[in-house]
Each structure stands twice: as structure tokens, then as C-alpha cells.
Amino acid sequence: MDLYSGYINQLIEELAALPGIGSKSAQRLAFHIINMPKGRVEKLARSMTDAKEHVRYCEECFTLTDAEKCPICSNEKRDHTTIMVVENTRDLAAYEKTGKYEGVYHVLHGAISPMLGIGPNDIRLKELMQRLQGEVDEVIIATNSSLEGETTAMYISKLIKPTGIRVTRIASGVPVGGDLEYIDEVTLLRALEGRVDL
């Protein structure tokens, strides 16, 4: 027997389907939303709809933005000769929090994982190679230190080496299997500063 009515159950189920939200958190959020003033609920719903309709990938680095180019790629003060390659937008945000990286990014939206059927053509490697046609001096590979992240890093390194562009990998300090989005800013900064040539 269901404890709650259909609308409450539906809201809980939809919230629980989000990553990182378990059934208890979904229940807590659902009750919070139900108890919010109607205007706030409408504003929340509108902001979700607006984000879904207007947010897209930056035409240059493929992070999420609501413009053709994201604020980082549009910023002329950034070092456009250095590209940091990350697996997802959350990893980009983690490095931006350090406030020390002055280059630009390239978001792959995944990592090579033969076990999951994800190959090089399933992530944004072709677009990365197209970006290297411009004036690029260094590519910093900042994929996660998981098996998939390491596989992706080695694949990218082999692709770029023949171009003569310097390819580096963030240093250890990031635990094996660790996701960058959960690493503190100091550790990320040390990993960036201690990067090694591949």
C-alpha cells in the first residue's frame, strides 16, 4: 500500500531518479517543495524549463552555457594556447574553483570505456583535434584517475604527440579512482602545478 497520494509519489519518484538523490532525500525534497509558496514552486519549475530549453554546449569547449561561447572561451584574458581536457563540466567547475588556472578547457563528455561500449568516437575527441589546428602550445589532460580516465589520457596523448604540441598529465595527489569534482581545491592545484609530460 502506498503511503502517499499519487501526486506526492510521482514527485518523490521523479526526484529520486536524479543522480545522487536517494529515496529519503527525494522524500525530504518533495515535502519541502510542497510546503513552498506557490510562486516559488512556479519559479523553480520555470527555471528548470528555461535551463532545458536554453542551455547548450559551448561551440568551442563543449561546456554548458546559454550563449554560443561560454564565458571562459569568450574571455580574451584567458590563455587560449593552453587547453585542459576534462571528462565533464563538473570537473571544469572544480578546476575553476582553484582560481589559479588561466587557460581554457575542452569537455569530453565521457571517457573511453570498452566495458561500457564507449569508444573514442563517442566522446569529443574529434572536436579536440580540430581545436589543435589553431595556436595551441600545451594540452593538459585532467581526466579522472580511474581506469577509464587513464585509458582516455593515454589515447589522447598518442593522438596529439605527432603534432608536436606539448601533452601533460595532472600529477598524482588525486587518488586512483577519485572523481575530480570531489577533490579539494588545494589538491587540484597541486596536481595541476605538478603535471608531467606524457
Segments (PLM) and residue ranges:
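Cys/His-rich Zn2+-binding cysteine-cluster or related metal-binding knuckle/ribbon modules and their
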Residues: 2-8, 17, 27-92
